[in-house]
């Protein structure tokens, strides 16, 4: 085998078809676009356009609104917290709060704080400070001998929400 004898597999590099270059090519005149009209023209189709029929997004009623005061909590379950303690990423003896969890990489970012959820089992006695917790999560922490302190969320302006 020589370097000059190396070739691509048959059909692995297909030549690009140039369209609209005469009827003899097989892709002339309409260039594979069918007949005339809007679909034969260049440009983006009108999204949601249904040929003049009232589009679905206008037939359905408007619902809801975006609450500008909505708080965005990072959620963490008990099983994930226990994994972090077992992996020594979080110290079980210290107070566990949003800053500790973000620094340990347990939660990616805590925009308005952390909310504790009750999936999984907890074996360690913990002192946790979070901005929200489900009743099963609080019960599981207290069953393991720990405490949960619920903090008041603080908005960007520095006032309590």
Curated annotation (Swiss-Prot):
Q: Which Pfam families has this protein been placed in?
A: Ribosomal_L27A
PROSITE patterns given in the database record: RIBOSOMAL_L15 (PS00475)
Q: One GO molecular function term? A: structural constituent of ribosome
- Write the record's keywords in alphabetical order, separated by commas: Ribonucleoprotein, Ribosomal protein, RNA-binding, rRNA-binding
Q: Biased-composition ranges for Gly residues?
A: 21-37
Q: Name one GO biological process term.
A: translation
| Keyword tRNA-binding appears in the UniProt entry | no
GO CC annotation: what is one?
cytosolic large ribosomal subunit
Whether Transferase counts among this entry's keywords is no
Query: Which Gene3D superfamilies does the entry mention?
Result: 3.100.10.10
Q: Which segments carry the region annotation Disordered?
A: 1-44
Subunit comment for this entry?
A: Part of the 50S ribosomal subunit.
PANTHER family of this UniProt entry? 50S RIBOSOMAL PROTEIN L15 (PTHR12934), LARGE RIBOSOMAL SUBUNIT PROTEIN UL15M (PTHR12934:SF11)
Q: Family per UniProt?
A: Belongs to the universal ribosomal protein uL15 family.
Q: What does this protein do?
A: Binds to the 23S rRNA.
| Protein name listed in UniProt | Large ribosomal subunit protein uL15
């Amino acid at each position: 085998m020589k370097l000059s004898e190396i070739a691509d597999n048959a059909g692995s590099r297909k030549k690009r078809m140039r369209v609209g270059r005469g009827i003899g090519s097989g892709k002339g005149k309409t260039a594979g676009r069918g007949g005339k009209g809007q679909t034969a023209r260049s440009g983006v189709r009108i999204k949601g356009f249904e040929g003049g029929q009232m589009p679905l997004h206008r037939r359905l009623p408007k619902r809801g609104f975006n609450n500008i005061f909505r708080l965005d909590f990072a959620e963490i379950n008990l099983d994930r917290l226990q994994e972090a303690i077992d992996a020594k990423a979080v110290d079980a003896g210290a107070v566990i709060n949003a800053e500790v969890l973000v620094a340990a990489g347990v939660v990616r970012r805590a925009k308005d704080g952390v909310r504790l959820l009750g999936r999984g089992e907890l074996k360690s006695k913990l002192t946790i400070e979070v901005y929200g917790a489900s009743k099963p999560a609080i019960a599981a922490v207290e069953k393991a001998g720990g405490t949960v302190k619920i903090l008041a969320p603080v908005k960007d302006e520095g006032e309590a929400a």
